[in-house]
Structure formats: C-alpha cells, structure tokens
Amino acid sequence: MASLIYRQLLANSYAVDLSDEIQSVGSEKNQRVTVDPGPFAQTGYAPVNRGPGEVNDSTVVQPVLDGPYQPAPFDLPVGNRMLLAPTGPGVVVEGTDNSGRWLSVILIEPGVTSETRTYTMFGSSKQVLVSNVSDTKWKLFEMMKTAVDGDYAEWGTLLSDIKIYGMMKYGERLFIYEGETPNARTKGYIVTNYTSVEVRPYSDFYIISRSQESACTEYINNGLPPIQNTRNVVPLAISSRSIKPRKVQPNEDIVVSKTSLWKELQYNRDIIIRFRFDNSIIKAGGLGYKWAEISFKAANYQYNYISDGEEVTAHTTCSVNGVNDFSFNGGSLPTDFAISRYEVIKENSYVYVHYWDDSQAFRNMVYVRSLAANLNDVMCSGGDYSFALLVGQWPVMKGGAVTLHTAGVTLSTQFTDFVSLNSLRFRFRLSVEEPSFTITRTRVSKLYGLPAANPNGGREYYEVAGRFSLISLVPSNDDYQTPIMNSVTVRQDLERRLNELREEFNNLSQEIAVSQLIDLAILPLDMFSMFSGIEGTVNAAKSMATNVIRKFKSSKLASSVSMLTDSLSDAASSISRSTSIRSIGSTASAWTNISKQTQDAVNEVATISSQLSQISGKLRLKEITTQTEGMSFDDISAAVLKANIDRSIQVDKNALPDVITEASEKFIRNRAYRVIDGDEAFEASTDGRFFAYKVETLEEMPFDIEKFADLVTRSPVISAIIDFKTLKNLNDNYGITREQAFNLLRSNPKVLRGFMDQNNPIIKNRIEQLIMQCRL
C-alpha cells in the first residue's frame, strides 16, 4: 500500500537521532579547530554600550593638572611649571644650564638638629650640613653652585606641611617657591641659557600651565586635589607626552586579530541617518464631520550621501512604540466634529530606526561583537493638519515637538520580498519640547508630544549624524564571503519556493484521474520509488532520505506515534458510562413533544460527540501501526503526493522534506474511521459525527459508546473511504450485496477499482471529494 512511505518514515526516525548526533559531534570538533568560541561565539544581539550620544558644546575643556609622571630626565617646556611630590627625605630634583647654574633641591624631615649628611648631586657625593628646627613642617632648600668645580651654597628655603615643590622656566629666569606654607610665594633666578635647562626629578611630578598660577600656588600651600591622592592614580612615563595624536578617519577598517582562517576586523563608520514618519488618517462614515483614526505607521526612506569621499546608498525604516491614544468628541450630533482616536508620542514612547547601507561593514555583519554607537540628538516638530469639514471653519491640529535621544543600538534584519539585509536598529527615547500642540476651534490646547497628524512638519526627512563601531569576524581571505550561521535569506527563498509549490500541487490535485489514483494507492511505495520522479535524486537518494526523515521526525504525526497507546487508553477511560443512544440522524427522528426529553437527548449527543472526537483524532495512528488489507486515507494521500511529485516541475531536494511533512499533516483533514464487530459497524469522524449500523441491512442502531471504546483498543481500525452516508446512498440507488457491503466497509481496493471501472458516479464522486481535500 502507498501508505508504506509514512510507516517507513516513522520506523526510521531513530536513524535521524544518530545522524544528528554524528553531525553535531563533527560540527563541534570543527569549531574547536577553526574558530575559538568566546568573543567569536556571539552571533545574536551584540553587546551594547549605551550612552547619551554626542553632546554639541563649543567650550574647550582643558585639564589643570597633567600627570602624574614617573621620575625621568625631562626638558621642561618654557612657560610650564613642574610640581614635584616627594614621599621621603633626600634629593628631590636637579637642574642645570651646563654653564653658570647647578641647582639641587633637598628635602629634610621635621625636627632635625644640625648634622652632616651625604647626598649624591650631579653624580658626585657631597657632604651637606642640614637642620630643620620646625617640628611639624618639612624643609625644602636649594643648594646651588655657579661653577663645575665650585662649592654648593644654600639659597632659598621652603617650609611645607605637604611636601609639594614647584619650578618653572620663563622670561630668562628659573622660578621656584620660597617662604612658609600657607603663604609661600614665587621667586626667580636669572639663568643665562634658561631655555636649555634640563631637570632631573627624583619623585613623581605634575605639569601645570603658567596660566594656572593661582591654582598652582593653591596646590603648593594646601595640597593637591583629593583625586590625586588615591591609589587609583598611576604615574605614567614622561615619554607618553610625545605620542603624536592620530587623526581619526571617517571610515576605518582595522585588523584587530588574525589567524590562518579568520580575522577580526573593526569597522568604524561615520553615518548620516535620514528618516521620516508616516501616518494613516481614516475618516469615519457619515456626513464628513468625524474621523475614525489618526495613527503612526512604519515609513521607509532611501537616500544617498557622501562618506569619506565615497557615495553611500542608505535605507532606513522608522517605526514607533508606546504611543498614547487621545480622542476628541465635540458632541453627539452627526454634524459635531469628533476624532475617535489619534496617536501621540511622548516621554514614555520610543522611536526605532533601522539603518542599512551598501558599505562593506554591512556585508560582514554576521559574527559581531563590541557594537557601539554615538548619535546626535534631533528635534522633531509637527506641522499643521486641517480637518476639512463640509460646512463651517475647519479645525486645525498644529504644533507639538519631541527630541530624540539615542538609547541603544542592536543588530537586526530588514526583510524584503527577495532578500534579508543585516541592519542596525537604533532606539531613541523621547523628551517633549515646546511648542505644545492644539486643535483650533476646540478646547484641546496645551498638550505636549508629537501627534500623528503631521509628524514631519512639511520636511522631507529628519537627519541625525553619528558614528558606530563594531568588530566582525570575517574570513582571512578577502575573496571568501562570510558564512551565515542562521541563513534567513536561504529560508526565505525556500519559503517562496514552497508557496509556489503549494499552489502548483493544489492545481495538479484537481487533474488527477481517479483510476490512476487507485492504481497508485495500492502500490507499495517506498522511499526510492517515491523520489524516483525527481531529476537528479538517484545519485543522492541516501542524503535525500535522511533529509526527509529528519524533517518528518518533527511532524505532528511522528511525535504522536510514541504516545499512541497512552493516548488511546486515556481517551477511552474518559468515556462516560452512559446509556446507548442513537446516532445524530436517528435522534432527530425520535423527536417527541416533551421539550425536556428533547433537550436531554441533544445534550447527550453533544457530549458523546465531544468524547468521540478525542478518540477519532488518534484512530489514524492506530490504523498506521496495525496495517490491514484495506485501502486507507494515507494510501490516497501518498498516491496524490506521488502523482504530484511526478508531474511537478518545481520540486527540488530542498523543498521535498517540507512538502512530504506538510502533506502528512494537511491532506484529507476530514476523515472517518470504523471498527467492525461481526455484523455491527461503528463509525466515527474527526468532526464528531458517529454512526452505528448493521452491515447486512445498513439499518442504524443505538451507538454503544462503551463497546466502541473497547473495540478501538483491541480491534483493527479501518479508514472509512466509503463512509456510511455514501454506502447507504449506494445501496438505496443501486443495491449492493452483503459481500460487497463488507468489502466496501473494509475499503477493499479491488472492489473499489471494480466500481470505478463501472464508472459508478457515487463512488467516483466520493473519491474525487477526498482528492480535493489533498491540498497544501
């Protein structure tokens, strides 16, 4: 029988488990070899750094303190002061012009009586008599000589609570601080070659501009800012000041990392986003004074702009979320102005803009991480919309404004009829602005937000400038395309082919000859014979079968087989043990004038019908697992499928698994099944109808639901190809013998073919009705 194809698919489902497991193991092994999971494994929504976006401000903010820097020889720039922060006693800093000045600054701790200490100054050890009579303050004093072989003499002194010392080259002088904190003041020494003075600090130091002299004096007397006194501030090498700043290009492709097969490429792009709102204005029926709806709807916009000397073609889609519904009712009369609903976006709303362009960044936007974007804010203000009334002055909705602030960016996909495009989805939060919106000649005024009546305000578009950055995983060979993990485009192509195939199948089903169908239905169709009509599948029959079984495994039919026994048992046990009743047709003939009895009978019929529908839905599974000699609905379904596959010109190996799975679920939805016990037959359909009758006379009898429930669990279930109504109609018009009746009840294919050869219109019409139900 043709339904062998379905049983073969069910019986071989275990092979799919093994195949999937082997394929999964192989895939995991390949991933370990070629791609390092971790940052490369992020393929859905990328990590997002949300921020306020770019803030337009013309003020130049310059830091007061530059540093701290690590001790190192340093050519102090003219006009900049060096602040030194020593942590212990000893030489703090040395400076010389190599001709007439050699200066060393020494730090002495509090409470030191007169004593001689040895210091290394300019590479030579010198003994210096030092003292500090203060018990609370540190002493910084300058030792200076005017010749290479000269002796050092003490010049200026600074008593400090906080151990901060400063010096600066400016105006042919070397300026230092002297006195006692908190009243220390600057003092200058004339230096002949002051521009060539090189200093050698022995402690961390800062650099501060001469223009900040008041702040510098404050630091000398009262200490550095609190943030500089934390352990989180780490001194840098002074060489970092000489790093030349690199001018950022509008568009950059930077290789972050690279292996033999893959590389991570960072795309930095300056973009211009142009978008516009769209709306729908629906006027209500009547005399023309009422409006049903004014709402936002998604708007597409395509444009070109120049980015880094190249022309870019961009596409945006703008939509809104979290709209606020307003209404206005001017009265109950037909000539009173009213708006049933108009939408307004406010602080609780969001605007979404999907952006895509034809640059290289969007062609490799598959495996992405570190996605971030900064965008300017944009103000959207509404325009005027006049409500054209038949008579009288027109109300005008005017005003309203909101500002869009960027609130995040994620990856998304824009779908068209033929392709799906990777895009960026920018989310904007809103803040209301002036002016408010009003409806003139009404009491609606001073409301804030942007109404949907004229959200663009006469503009063609709104524009936002910004920059985004992402790191994408791409093949190292630029000639290769990025593989797509979840190929939405491929799936869409398959769906489009499936839709075309469904339409073709439905048309072909109407052209199948009934005699041809019977011949196909009684053939034992297996996997190879089912696919033999498709060109090019002979060599790929093995992989074709695996693909079909894999798809069929997820069908409702396959998932229900494993639960067949439990389902039938549960359904049978739920049958209420009530008295036997006649079928639906017989109940009507048993009508009496007593309304209560009539209502009880109708209720009982409805209850039985509901209970039987639970069982009849499982009878197909019971029939598949207990094959009989008769023809089944699945034989007809498989025969129609085979006939259409042979005649179709659009079936391919990619679409076939979906077609077979869909056919198993959707072909012949309205089915009837019967069980036979001696001379009695019980018949139940999937739509809840049921009959019980004698086989020899075809007379109805009371439907014993308990007996039926018992029979379906232990007796063969037969497809009612020729249902009771058709059988009774055939007997009434042509007359059939008891043997013919039994053969038709058992759906004997030879007897059915005999009636078809005789061109019996009743049997032929029944088969044609079943064929018409074979639709996708």
UniProtKB/Swiss-Prot annotation:
Residues covered by region (Spike head): 65-224
Region: Spike foot, residue numbers: 510-776
Residue ranges of the region described as Hydrophobic: 389-409
Disulphide bonds in the chain: 318-380
Motif (DGE motif): 308-310
Stored HAMAP family: Rota_A_VP4 (MF_04132), Rota_VP4 (MF_04125)
Gene source species: Rotavirus A (strain RVA/Cow/United States/B641/XXXX/G6P7[5]) (RV-A)
Pfam families referenced in this protein's UniProt entry, alphabetically: Rota_VP4_MID, VP4_haemagglut, VP4_helical
Motif mapping: YGL motif: 448-450
GO terms for cellular component: host cell endoplasmic reticulum-Golgi intermediate compartment; host cell plasma membrane; host cell rough endoplasmic reticulum; host cytoskeleton; membrane; viral outer capsid
Similarity-based family: Belongs to the rotavirus VP4 family.
Keywords attached to this entry: Capsid protein, Coiled coil, Disulfide bond, Hemagglutinin, Host cell membrane, Host cytoplasm, Host cytoskeleton, Host endoplasmic reticulum, Host membrane, Host-virus interaction, Membrane, Outer capsid protein, Viral attachment to host cell, Viral penetration into host cytoplasm, Viral penetration via permeabilization of host membrane, Virion, Virus entry into host cell
Positions of region (Spike body and stalk (antigen domain)): 248-479
Phylogenetic lineage: Viruses, Riboviria, Orthornavirae, Duplornaviricota, Resentoviricetes
Residues marked Cleavage (site): 231-232, 241-242, 247-248
A Gene Ontology biological process term: virion attachment to host cell
Domain of life per record: Viruses
Positions in coiled-coil regions: 484-518
Gene3D superfamilies assigned to the protein according to its UniProt record, in alphabetical order: 1.20.5.170, 2.60.120.200
Note: This strain probably does not use sialic acid to attach to the host cell. In group A rotaviruses, VP4 defines the P serotype.
Protein name: Outer capsid protein VP4
